[in-house]
Amino acid sequence: MDLPGPIHDFLLVFLGSGLILGGLGVVLRINPIYSAFSLGLVLVCISLFYILTNYHFVATAKLLIYVGAINVLILFVVMFMNSSEYYKDFNPWTIGNGLTSLVCTSILVSLISTILDTSWYGIIWTTRSNQIIEQDLIGNSQQIGIHLATDFFLPFEFISIILLVALIGAIDVTLQ
């Protein structure tokens, strides 16, 4: 999206704060329904980030797949479970949670220090698909495939990893 600088910066800060608050809501909420709504906020903010960077196809796919299907499925599963018995005797701070918080905080600090120390100007992420194949010689479905393999490779891989984690989590919930 071609926006003026101050508006673009404001939207980045607004979406980033919504993403952070939604992520904290997913982790810190005791009620799983509120946690699922916070997850929906996180997914919508991520889709809006993709719209700001002119990746409209990935944003639409993320909204349809994650918010429209997976988050609604999570809400249905949570509502069908008797969730009041799970968080009635909930103690949020145990030794395991403290250790997990310490590990996650150290990973976050190392990621932030790595991001700040990296020179991002010399990094070329992907090659443009119009340099590989002439776009007028191929159809729309082939263009989508080429874009997924070149321009949207990293987001596509991140989506597949998130789907794998969701599948493992569903299996874990089913076996308990």
From Swiss-Prot:
Compartment(s) where it occurs, according to its Swiss-Prot or TrEMBL record:
Plastid, Chloroplast thylakoid membrane
Q: What is its EC number?
A: 7.1.1.-
Show the catalytic activity.
Answer: a plastoquinone + NADH + (n+1) H(+)(in) = a plastoquinol + NAD(+) + n H(+)(out); a plastoquinone + NADPH + (n+1) H(+)(in) = a plastoquinol + NADP(+) + n H(+)(out)
Sorted alphabetically, the keyword list is: Chloroplast, Membrane, NAD, NADP, Plastid, Plastoquinone, Quinone, Thylakoid, Translocase, Transmembrane, Transmembrane helix, Transport
Q: Which InterPro entries match?
A: NAD(P)H-Q_Oxidoreduct_6, NADH_UbQ/plastoQ_OxRdtase_su6, Nuo/plastoQ_OxRdtase_6_NuoJ
EC class: translocase
The molecule here is called NAD(P)H-quinone oxidoreductase subunit 6, chloroplastic
Q: Which Pfam families match?
A: Oxidored_q3
User: Major place of localization?
Assistant: plastid
GO cellular component terms, semicolon-separated: chloroplast thylakoid membrane
Q: Where are the transmembrane segments?
A: 7-27, 32-52, 61-81, 93-115, 151-171
Source species of the chain: Gossypium barbadense (Sea Island cotton)
Q: Which family does it belong to?
A: Belongs to the complex I subunit 6 family.
Identify its membrane topology class: Multi-pass membrane protein
Which one of the record's GO molecular function terms can you name? Answer: NADH dehydrogenase (ubiquinone) activity
| Summary of the function given for this chain in its UniProt record | NDH shuttles electrons from NAD(P)H:plastoquinone, via FMN and iron-sulfur (Fe-S) centers, to quinones in the photosynthetic chain and possibly in a chloroplast respiratory chain. The immediate electron acceptor for the enzyme in this species is believed to be plastoquinone. Couples the redox reaction to proton translocation, and thus conserves the redox energy in a proton gradient.
Assembly and interaction partners: NDH is composed of at least 16 different subunits, 5 of which are encoded in the nucleus.
Q: Sorted alphabetically, which Gene3D superfamilies does this protein's record hold? A: NADH-ubiquinone/plastoquinone oxidoreductase chain 6, subunit NuoJ
Gene name, per UniProt, is ndhG
